[in-house]
């Protein structure tokens, strides 16, 4: 039998799993079934997500890396892998166009449906790699598309974002759901509170959930 991905794909397993997970979401974001289910009202939601994903994978996330360094973190490797692979494979039909305007690099998606098909192709290949434990193919995919950083783009990102004084990482503060119970102990309503700072929430999680397995 085939071993677990952590055994067969070794140090590339996490990056490939992150890519697989992202690709599932990206593929279905452009599915009209989401409109049928009432989850979105227009496929512009998917298009905006595609724009953001390519921009982040190729440019924005580079603010987190020192100039000249390679990408080592799995989530970041995954995002560049997906974006750069799609750009290369879609280049014959100009699916994603690299534009230099006034000396600044931009990426413009010219065909969202074809990009969706490319995401599906990559998802199929990564699923095959994981299912078959194809270490060599997984290694080549990650090392070719997810590790090395274009020096010119990296330099430009750091220069363009420096005046913004923007933190390289962002955090989330989640709402706290407080159930209201009747005399029988049944939940009758939920009160949503969102009055914690990020630090307060981390301390709250540590106090209340640190013993969970």
Please give the residue ranges for each predicted region.
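Non-catalytic terminal regions of proteins
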Residues: 97-213
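An active-site-proximal "capping" alpha-helix that borders the catalytic cofactor pocket
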Residues: 14-31
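Long, well-structured alpha-helical subdomains associated
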Residues: 26-129
């Amino acid at each position: 039998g085939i071993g677990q991905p952590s055994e067969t794909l070794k140090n590339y397993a996490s990056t490939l799993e992150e890519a697989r997970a992202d690709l599932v979401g990206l593929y279905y974001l452009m599915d009209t079934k989401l409109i049928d289910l009432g989850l979105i009202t227009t496929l512009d939601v998917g298009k905006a997500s595609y724009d953001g994903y390519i921009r982040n994978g190729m440019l924005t996330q580079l603010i987190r890396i020192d100039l000249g360094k390679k990408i080592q973190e799995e989530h970041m490797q995954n995002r560049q892998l997906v974006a750069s692979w799609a750009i290369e494979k879609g280049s014959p039909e100009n699916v994603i166009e690299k534009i230099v305007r006034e000396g600044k690099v931009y990426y413009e998606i010219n065909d969202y449906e074809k990009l969706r098909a490319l995401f599906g192709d990559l998802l199929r290949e990564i699923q095959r790699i994981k299912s078959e434990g194809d270490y060599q193919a997984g290694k080549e995919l990650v090392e070719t598309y997810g590790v090395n950083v274009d020096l010119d783009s990296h330099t430009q990102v750091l220069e363009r974002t420096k005046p913004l004084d923007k933190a390289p990482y962002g955090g989330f503060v989640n709402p706290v759901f407080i159930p209201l119970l009747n005399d029988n102990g049944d939940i009758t309503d939920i009160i949503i509170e969102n009055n914690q700072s990020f630090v307060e929430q981390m301390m709250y999680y540590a106090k209340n959930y640190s013993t969970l397995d």
